[in-house]
Swiss-Prot record:
<keyword id="KW-1015">Disulfide bond</keyword>
<feature type="signal peptide">
    <location>
        <begin position="1"/>
        <end position="23"/>
    </location>
</feature>
<dbReference type="InterPro" id="IPR050263">
    <property type="entry name" value="Bact_Fimbrial_Adh_Pro"/>
</dbReference>
<comment type="similarity">
    <text>Belongs to the fimbrial protein family.</text>
</comment>
<dbReference type="InterPro" id="IPR000259">
    <property type="entry name" value="Adhesion_dom_fimbrial"/>
</dbReference>
<dbReference type="InterPro" id="IPR036937">
    <property type="entry name" value="Adhesion_dom_fimbrial_sf"/>
</dbReference>
<feature type="disulfide bond">
    <location>
        <begin position="41"/>
        <end position="86"/>
    </location>
</feature>
<comment type="function">
    <text>Part of the yadCKLM-htrE-yadVN fimbrial operon. Could contribute to adhesion to various surfaces in specific environmental niches.</text>
</comment>
<dbReference type="Pfam" id="PF00419">
    <property type="entry name" value="Fimbrial"/>
</dbReference>
<dbReference type="GO" id="GO:0043709">
    <property type="term" value="P:cell adhesion involved in single-species biofilm formation"/>
</dbReference>
<keyword id="KW-0281">Fimbrium</keyword>
<protein>
    <recommendedName>
        <fullName>Uncharacterized fimbrial-like protein YadN</fullName>
    </recommendedName>
</protein>
<keyword id="KW-0732">Signal</keyword>
<dbReference type="InterPro" id="IPR008966">
    <property type="entry name" value="Adhesion_dom_sf"/>
</dbReference>
<dbReference type="GO" id="GO:0007155">
    <property type="term" value="P:cell adhesion"/>
</dbReference>
<dbReference type="GO" id="GO:0009289">
    <property type="term" value="C:pilus"/>
</dbReference>
Length: 194
């Protein structure tokens, strides 16, 4: 290689390094989450797919008037169900399904789900509560609490079970009013069998 070409390439490399070092830089983070399962049985949210979208009705700030309560749903409660169907499972996973809930990004110590404050114009001071509805019994789901297990026997004939829940708005702090804005959060449910 000639010395002229070597000097030209060296100069180009210095220009690239110098240009990169002096440039302004912007960036951000990507939150990536997922779930890997062995698909022992099929699950469906509201009769659809295993992943569901629960759309709550619009609530006024005044309607979100309390923090989370163990045996009472919050504002604009939306019912939804999760069906576990083991009729096609081979081998049979057992006769009982046990469900828990967790959230990598939005769980908190009250067992509710924080609002995603990274969205445009988020509501501040509001959480989402999930409650299990078992007949006339209402019980708050404790997100990220592995001891908060919802157990159902699989029907002997259909090999299935249906869990009923409600999602609702609650105050993040009981004595602080929520602000107007959008609400978005997520949770994952996990089912084990015995």
């Amino acid at each position: 290689m000639s010395k002229k070409l070597g000097f030209a390439l060296s100069g180009l490399m210095l220009a690239m390094v110098a240009g990169t070092a002096s440039a302004d830089m912007d960036g951000g983070q990507l939150n990536i989450s997922g779930l890997v399962v062995d698909n022992t049985c099929e699950t469906r949210v509201d009769g659809g797919n295993k992943d569901g979208l629960i759309l709550l009705q619009t609530a006024t700030v005044g309607e979100i008037d309390a923090g989370v309560l163990n045996d009472t749903v919050g504002a604009k409660a939306k019912p939804f169900s999760i069906t576990v169907d083991c009729s096609k499972a081979n081998p049979n996973p057992g006769s009982t399904a046990k469900m828990t809930f967790g959230s990598v990004f939005f769980g908190n110590s009250k067992g509710t789900l924080n609002n995603d404050m990274s969205i445009n114009n988020p509501s501040d001071g509001v959480n989402i509560a999930l409650h299990n509805i078992d007949g006339s019994t209402i019980k708050q789901v404790q997100i990220n609490n592995p001891g908060d297990v919802y157990t159902k026997a699989l029907d002997a004939t259909t090999k299935s079970a249906v869990y009923d829940f409600k999602a609702s708005y609650v105050r993040a702090v009981a004595d602080q009013t929520a602000t107007a804005g959008y609400v978005k959060t997520n949770t994952a449910y996990t089912i084990t069998y015995q």
